[in-house]
Amino acid sequence: MLLTTYGTEYDAVVKTMHLYIDGCKQGNSRVMRPAFHENAGFFGYAGPDLAIGTSFLFDWVDKNGPSPHIRPRFVSVDILETIAAVRLEVDGWSGSLAGPSVCMSDIFTLLKTPDGWRIIQKAFHWHS
């Protein structure tokens, strides 16, 4: 991939990721839904329970409510033509379900579609 193409694609991937981040900050799944492909996968443990499916994520975000002070950090963004992998660390989660301060480690896989970059998979670890 040419460096100029990589820079353009990097910006587009990060823009998609910010839809997810903004939805988390606002506690509003409608903000983040456009970032996800309609058939996206979602897996991880929320405490001792295995969480599966984007419907779990969207419901959780809406029920948790706003978490305006989260601190997201892109650990890595790897892009290969039409696929991307993003590792995201998010500190400072708060809200009715998260509690006072929780850290999340996320690994996302994105696919470049005709409509832009979309999250096709999210796996997470909740640090308690």
Each language-model region and where it sits:
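Short beta-strand edge/turn micro-motifs at domain boundaries
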Residues: 103-128
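Short beta-strand segments enriched in hydrophobic/aromatic residues
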Residues: 36, 90-92, 123-126
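Surface-exposed, charged secondary-structure patches
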Residues: 5, 12, 41-100
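Short, hydrophobic secondary-structure boundary micro-motifs
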Residues: 33, 43-45, 120-121
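Short, low-complexity N-terminal intrinsically disordered segments enriched in polar/charged residues
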Residues: 1-30, 34-38
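Short, conserved clusters of charged catalytic residues that mark active-site
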Residues: 15-16, 69, 105
